[in-house]
Every structure is written in structure tokens, then in C-alpha cells.
Amino acid sequence: IYRMHANKREEIESVGAGDIVAVMGLKQTTTGETLSDEKSPVILESMDFPAPVIQVAIEPKSKGDQEKLGVAIQRLAEEDPSFQVHSDEETGQTIIGGMGELHLEVLVDRMRREFKVEANVGKPQVAYRETIRQAVEKVEYTHKKQTGGTGQFARVIIAIEPIESGDTSYEFVNKVTGGRVPKEYIPSVDAGAQEAMQFGILAGYEMTGVRVTLLDGAYHEVDSSELAFKIAGSQAFKEAARKAKPVLLEPMMAVEVTTPEDYMGEVIGDINSRRGQIQAMEERAGARVVKGLVPLSEMFGYVGDLRSKTSGRASYSMQFDSYAEVPRNVAEEIIAKAKGE
């Protein structure tokens, strides 16, 4: 057990409440787990980790780096639950996501230093979201396909509405009565709706904050199947979402800038120019602290800009705060770019 200092570590025999220490050799322990005495077991409440708000594409520079990159990503993801990775189905690229530009820069640097991986990294991409602003009371969709032999048939009637709580991204409610849709097909409708939410209808970004209610439907004893109802659920959701006033959401970052008072005007003006909202200003240890909410898309390159405007005398920190609706003129540009227009 070690107490960590800036340039050294100190071995200690025991730790008390509130101590922060490093423990060596825990090969079976992962982030979020609780360690306790076997005789007095205790489990602390699990931590909630936010979803990534920024993504970059990463690819190995050579075939030799391919395997090392996979190992590095796996190890880093085990350590840091806020770091996520997936493959883009259309391009085949590996996409890594994190909580900010600096977060991903540090992870890529660790890949190079600790795992000897040389990789090409793309430009950061903001993880936008889509949601709806209006309820749609009834949308009916029938999936019907007839080829030689057994066909496909499923009819669903759904309603969708926005979820006001920001903590819930999706809900599914079943209100079918009288066996109009057999119980074994209900989860397929749910799965179809969730699949459709992965790619929103405005610009293909994941959707959030939607409640789907299955109202009614119909089936065929021979031609109906789980696949048919999944397709019907997916298509019904897409049709309903188009009618529900879809909007684009962007991640907002809580930004805190510490600056000498002489540069307060420059700092505030710069935040305002980035579509930011000043939340508070206070004094701390002889310096001024400016707190605000700024769209993540406007924070790229902020380190250099802040250094330039304050002669290197200001510093800042930021963390994800929430998602907010993108202004119409900005949303139109984002949607056009996503569609390649």
C-alpha cells in the first residue's frame, strides 16, 4: 500500500477513512469494485459513469501495431469505464470515445508510451444526440412480405412521447390486450424500436429521451415471427419519430476558468463568442474564477486560445454537464454535414 506524492511514493501499513492510496498487484480488481475484510464484508454503491461526449477514429500505422492496439484498448477500457470503443459498421474504423479532447489525448499518449503502439488518430467528433419534442398518439405499420413458401407478417400500432426526466434515455410500455400481439413477439417490437434509436432520423445520431408505447397490432399464425415484429417495430418507430418534431442535442461542458482580474473581460468575451453562458463569477486565492456552460463543439483548441488571450496566466478545467438543444441555424449545418451535403 502506497501514499502517492508528486515525485515519490511512500509505503504505509494501514489506511483510514478518507485516505487516498495506491495498491499494487490487484490483478483481479476492476474500477468500481469494493475491497473489504472477509470477516466484515461491505459493498459500496456502484458508480454511474457518463457516456462519452467526444469520439475519434484510430487505426494502427502498421500490421505490427494492429494486435498491440487491440490489447492496449482493452486494457485501458478495463481501467477507465468512461473510455469506450466500438467499430463503425459503414467504414470499419475503430472509434474511441471519452469525456473530452484532453482525455483522449492522454489515452492515445499512454498507448504510445506504455504499449508501444503507433497509431493514426482522426479529428475529434462531437457525440451529438437526437430526441423528440412532441408526442405522436398513433402510428400504424404493417410489415408484409410474401415470397415462395412462408412469408412475413406483423402489424404494430405505437405511440411515442418525450421523456421529461433527463436521467432516462428510453422506456417501452406494453398496452396490448386480448392477445392481439402474442406475448413472445412483444420483446421483438421493443428490440426493433431500440435498434432504430441507434441511428436518428435527422443526422444518424443516437436518440435519447423517448417513451414508446405498443398499443395494438395483429399477427398471422403462419407468417408472423420475431424478425417480422422487430422490423415492424423499427419502421413504426422511424415513422413516428419523423412526426414528433425531432431535434438535435449537443453536450454542454461546465467550464471553470481561473484568471487574473486584468484578463476577466477577455475571458468572458471569449466564452460568450463560443455560445457559452456565464453561470457565476467569484474570487479565489487572489484570482478571479469564471464559471460557465459551453457547447463542447466550441471548445476545440481552447487551450491555445486561452493562453494567447491571457499571456499564459489563466488556466481552466471542464467536465460534462448535460445535453441541450442545438440552435436551429447551427443544427442545420451539422445535419447537412452529416448527410454529406
Curated annotation (Swiss-Prot):
Name of this protein: Elongation factor G
Listed Gene3D superfamilies: 3.30.230.10, 3.30.70.240, Elongation Factor G (Translational Gtpase), domain 3 (3.30.70.870), Translation factors (2.40.30.10)
The organism's taxonomic lineage, starting at the top: Bacteria, Bacillati, Actinomycetota, Actinomycetes, Kitasatosporales
Keywords, alphabetical: Cytoplasm, Elongation factor, GTP-binding, Nucleotide-binding, Protein biosynthesis
GO molecular function term, any single one: translation elongation factor activity
Short name of one Pfam family: EFG_C
Primary location: cytoplasm
Subcellular location: Cytoplasm
PANTHER family the record matches: RIBOSOME-RELEASING FACTOR 2, MITOCHONDRIAL (PTHR43261:SF1), TRANSLATION ELONGATION FACTOR G-RELATED (PTHR43261)
Keyword Transmembrane helix: no
Source organism (scientific name): Streptomyces ramocissimus
Function of the protein: Catalyzes the GTP-dependent ribosomal translocation step during translation elongation. During this step, the ribosome changes from the pre-translocational (PRE) to the post-translocational (POST) state as the newly formed A-site-bound peptidyl-tRNA and P-site-bound deacylated tRNA move to the P and E sites, respectively. Catalyzes the coordinated movement of the two tRNA molecules, the mRNA and conformational changes in the ribosome.
Matching InterPro entries: EFG_II (IPR041095), EFG_III (IPR009022), EFG_III/V (IPR035647), EFG_IV (IPR047872), EFG_V (IPR035649), EFG_V-like (IPR000640), Ribosomal_Su5_D2-typ_SF (IPR020568), Ribsml_uS5_D2-typ_fold_subgr (IPR014721)
Recorded name of the encoding gene: fus
Recorded family membership: Belongs to the GTP-binding elongation factor family. EF-G/EF-2 subfamily.
CC per GO annotation: cytoplasm
GO process annotations (BP): ribosome disassembly
